[in-house]
Regions:
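Long, structured stretches of catalytic cores involved in phosphate-ester chemistry, encompassing
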Residues: 1-203
Length: 203
């Protein structure tokens, strides 16, 4: 009976909390509408004009972001939004779509945006300041709980803050509502709740 069965693509939005303590979680589908990835010698190449989200999902996303009453917006996708250098799946494989995404954030200016991603077998936190956005955007990448790329010790990411985590890990967001504006503690943790990376963000 899920309404997702009535649409193309598995994207959805969910709002939690009430009043001035609302969190909107937006889950994007980065596979259903995506054009095939381009490879040369096994390495993904930028597709400058390729479709990524599909127009219906773009329209829906703009609607969810425009005049949203939420104080924090958590936007998740299976692949990384911000990192550009890594050679695997990422939004940067579709540069036009990546620009469009950050331009949409700058246009709608939703408060408290935090990006979530995975599918890398590493953990890291990235930060990026899009043109026209009043504050920098942070992305938490965490994966995985059962497998980790322990050999990955020096992957380039000009946007990374803190270390790369090449051990089993999970991501955690803690929201502090006691301040005039919400403060979010972004963390990557591991076994026995060990904290590998922690970054406090105010909006």
């Amino acid at each position: 009976d899920s309404p997702l069965r009535k649409q193309e693509g598995g994207y959805s939005a969910h709002t939690y909390g009430s009043g001035d303590k609302q969190v909107k979680v937006i889950l994007l589908d980065g596979r259903y509408f995506r054009e095939p990835l381009q490879r040369v010698d096994g390495v993904y190449q930028p597709n400058q004009t390729g479709t990524f989200l599909g127009e219906a999902q773009w329209r829906w996303l703009e609607k969810e972001l425009t005049n949203s009453k939420a104080a924090v917006h958590v936007i998740g996708c299976g692949i990384q939004f911000i990192p550009e250098e890594q050679r695997f799946e990422k939004w940067a494989n579709f540069p036009q779509a990546r620009r469009r995404f950050f331009d949409l954030l700058a246009k709608t200016k939703p408060p408290g945006v935090v990006l979530l991603s995975g599918d890398r077998h590493i953990g890291e936190i990235s930060r990026y300041q899009p043109d026209g956005m009043p504050y920098p955007i942070h992305e938490v990448t965490s994966s995985g709980l059962t497998h980790a790329a322990t050999q990955n010790t020096s992957e380039a990411n000009q946007h990374r803050i803190g270390p790369i985590v090449n051990q089993l890990n999970f991501g955690l967001l803690e929201i502090d509502w006691s301040q005039p504006k919400p403060q979010v503690n972004l963390q990557i943790r591991g076994k026995e709740n060990a904290v590998f990376v922690s970054e406090k963000v105010s909006f």
